Regions:
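Juxtamembrane/interfacial segments at transmembrane-helix boundaries in multi-pass membrane proteins
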Residues: 58-81
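Membrane interfacial helix-start motif at the N-side
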Residues: 42-43, 117-127, 283-303
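Core segments of transmembrane alpha-helices
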Residues: 51-56, 128-136, 303-314
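Membrane-interface helix-loop junction between the first two transmembrane segments
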Residues: 16-37
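Substrate-recognition/cap regions that form aromatic- and gly/pro-loop-enriched pockets
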Residues: 291-331
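A membrane-cytosol interface segment of integral membrane proteins
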Residues: 222-270
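Membrane-embedded catalytic scaffold of the fatty acid hydroxylase/desaturase
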Residues: 43-52, 74-230
Length: 331
């Protein structure tokens, strides 16, 4: 069961509470333009499910039928504990390679484009992650974890990650050693040199400690949020596609046929030498970083807000209809 649909009202309430708290203590972490952009991308990521075909789902079915170990008992507690741990392990490697390989970063980058850090950032999700992300969860089906368990623990993992996107909670003592927290996840969203590409866990931070990717948040190094190549746009289509466009452009322009292919499997940040020389990209110094914050006229903001609310209501209607249909079929 996908529990994210049921969590949406809690998400909205929590965002309003965080906003009110920030205003009350004179430490507001919200900007209308940035928050709207994050929420719009979140809506698109959910709407995408209605218009795409799941290649991954078909592969999972084939694995379950022909290649997996005997299915585990979905009513046994051990199945759920194993699934929760294994899901986060698979997520760690998807997340890590999502930063280290350009083709995967192209899908994940949308989540990191926000230059603020608040609960709307948690909802800033990709709409293209389904293209390759499913590959990393194949081990769960190979060991015989039932599909309904995988989907449920996946939604629990995602819901857990919501609350860690806040600047208002400090370090949490012993909890920091085992689980992902606001402090160690703030590090993950930073573009500071010392923090870059660290803390990939979704539920457990233990993977980062085990595989050498952990970095503690330091008082002397305030976090600078965002990406090294700022988007400088509120256009959601550009937010979702700009890395793909950059890869295609570099592949087209380079004269070396090997580099034309290498672009698509390279480490994040790599570019063909001839293209990098003829079309260098702006280098960002986090120490002097200035947030993208153009003034948006009031009427435009109101119209955009109206569109967002309408989209959320329509999406909620479609998801409820989908749930009702599924329950009807089950009966």
């Amino acid at each position: 069961m996908n529990l994210v649909v049921y969590a949406v009202p809690i998400f909205i309430l929590a965002i309003l509470v965080e906003l009110a708290y920030g205003l009350a203590v004179h430490r507001n972490t919200y900007r209308l333009n940035d928050s709207f952009s994050s929420l719009a991308l979140g809506v698109l990521s959910q709407a995408r499910r209605f218009v795409t075909l799941g290649v991954g789902g078909y592969v999972y079915h084939l694995i379950t039928v022909y290649f997996s170990l005997p299915l585990m008992d979905a009513s046994h507690w051990f199945t759920w504990v194993l699934a929760m741990v294994l899901y986060d392990f698979c997520y760690y490697w998807l997340h890590r390679l999502g930063h280290e390989r350009t083709i995967l970063w192209a899908a994940h980058v949308a989540h990191h484009q926000s230059e603020d850090y608040n609960l709307t950032t948690a909802l800033r999700q990709t709409s293209t992650g389904f293209l390759l992300g499913w590959i990393f969860y194949i081990p769960m089906y190979l060991v015989g974890i039932p599909a309904e368990v995988v989907v449920t623990v996946g939604s629990i993992n995602l819901i857990y990650q919501f609350w860690v996107h806040t600047e208002h909670l400090p370090k949490l003592g012993w909890y920091e050693w085992i689980f992902v927290t606001p402090s160690n996840h703030r590090v993950h969203h930073a573009q500071n040199d010392i923090y870059l590409d660290r803390n990939y866990g979704g539920l457990f931070i233990l993977w980062d400690r085990l595989f050498g990717t952990f970095q503690e948040e330091l008082d002397e190094e305030p976090v600078v949020y965002g990406i090294r190549g700022p988007l400088k746009s509120w256009n959601p289509v550009r937010a979702l596609t700009h890395i793909y466009v950059d890869m295609a452009r570099d592949s087209w322009r380079t004269a070396d046929w090997r580099d034309k292919l290498r672009v698509w499997v390279s480490r994040t940040g790599w570019r063909p030498a001839d293209v990098a020389a003829s079309d260098p990209r702006e280098k960002i110094d986090p120490a002097h970083f200035v947030k993208y914050d153009p003034r948006v006229p009031g009427p435009v903001s109101l119209y955009a807000l109206f569109q967002l609310v309408a989209a959320v209501l329509l999406l909620n209607f479609m998801e409820n209809a989908e749930l009702a249909y599924g329950q009807g079929v089950a009966l």
